[in-house]
Amino acid sequence: MKFKKFASLALSTVMAASMLAGCGSGAAESTETTSNQTETKTETATTTETASGDTAAVSEVSHDSEYTVDFYDVAANFQGVQSGWYSKIVKDKFNMNLNIIAPQVSGDGAALYQTRCAAGALGDLIILDNADMQECVESGLIHDLTDVIAQYPNLSKYMEQIKAFNSMLGDGSKIYAIPLEMNTNGPTAYKQLHVYTYPRMGWDMYNEVGAPELKNTDDLLNCLADIQKAHPQNDKGDPAYAISLWKDWDSQYMECVAQLTKWYGQEVNGSVLIGTDNSIVPLTDKAGAYYKMLKFFYQANKMGLVDPDSATQDWNMMVSKMQDKRVYLYWYSWQYGFWNTPAKGEEGVNYIEIPVADTNLYQASDTYYGDGRVIAVGSQVSDENFARLMEFLDWYASPEGVQIQHGGTEGLIYTVENGKYVLTEDGLNRFSAEVAVPEDQGGGNWNDGNNQINQWIVASCDINPDTNEPYGTDMWSSTIKMNETKTTKEWSEKFGAADDVEYLLKNNMMTVVPSINIALAIDTTDISLIRKQCGDIIKDASWRMVFAADDVDFEKQWDDMTSQLEGLGWADLTAFDTEKYGPMLEARKAAQ
């Protein structure tokens, strides 16, 4: 295997808003650029100072012709042409339409990727995981940005991170890709208000069942069972369950299980579990957290706590259920957006973290160097379109572009008071209710028109120079003050901490792990085949085990799964991944 010896720090989490767009349907086949004339001709030119002090001018960019951008995006939960309020902003500024090609919802993402790569045109804009980007650079599918990127002032703010990542591509001398979720806060900081994944439930319901101390996941399940027994339906009379799952985010394993492994100090990476102690073990290790948390879901189902729709529903259905309070356990921090509001907090009904004493949370640090995905321009685009795409990317990294991505639009979503941003009522409710967008801003429902790219160049924790506060709405001083409610005050009084981050750190229940953004070894043809076959087995078996008939059936299915994997070359795959992640662990040790 061939590894680059450079490592940099990055975040492996996905920021709060990055998962809020639901899955969609619709054709996302490659479209040709059209040449319809707009009513007015717009040209832009930018003059900037490069890192060397030389003045460089960006060529004039004409927006005279409409440009439909084929956007291949592994982060997207929507497939088709962006619509609604975000579409209007992009169309008005750049005369562009974004045709999002989403392997995650295409039915067969691997086949889509291979087909488009073979055709020599993956997309005009491309978001990929690091390893796939490395492969595409070597295949000639990615446009060289080396000679132009310094001309773009907003991208240039992150030149340290951009150069660090690109030093791992090719011979390290050129710039091809821009890391995503970067910030300027420093490489080892964790400045989020909440941990990324942890048990969360309604404060009112937790107190209603006696606010029990939770020593382990058995106690957590018993608490949830009491809540579901008291509330088998929501206020509308719809059935409600402690736990609801969805499978359309699954990749090589059951994603819902993989997120919960972090509660017990391990993160799933390919076929292996990487621990807070820098250990690596196979995902199939019975002493590992994947087995433990898969069994947690099985035990929950045996107790009648798992939504029977889980095996068939998609993310859209899940969102609807959260908005109607039909799900009693959350784990992602960003799920708060589908229910919590300051008003509900004053009623004491917001969801909030509930400590489980035996957890040791695997929490990655903030995303200084990027999160493991990158954005690039396809090599097949014309010179004219290349200039337009670079202009768009620079805006996407600008304070205006970042503010729109993380905070929405002024007037509808927030107002400006004394130089600070304050969420409106619609802003507070934009993910939990139907917020109508005025026709002159694009019309429709706000959430439906949200940015379907679903990843950002700049993370929400970065500082907006216009306010000297983070871009993320939950980190605005006005929002923090609004969220100081009956719920948070009672929680702090009970647990003796200002928030979950403070509580978990103080009680040695959380380890902040330096995130590593490194171009890892690319799968060989044989390993790629083994990974696909093993991934299909793991996903199928994991879902079946959640609904196993009894303990004996669960154990038999686990053993059958591991036997099947061994016959497919599992040992070779885990050996490959163990070596693959070795440089990442060495870089992590150096950063600790």
Question: Which residues does each PLM region occupy?
Answer:
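Helix-loop-helix "hinge/cap" segment bordering the ligand-binding cleft or interdomain interface
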Residues: 152, 174, 179-253, 274-321, ...
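Ligand-binding "clamshell"
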Residues: 135-148, 340-362
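Conserved small-residue motifs centered on glycine
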Residues: 403-540
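C-terminal motif of bacterial Sec signal peptides marking the signal peptidase cleavage site
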Residues: 18-22
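Bacterial Sec-dependent N-terminal signal peptides
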Residues: 1-10
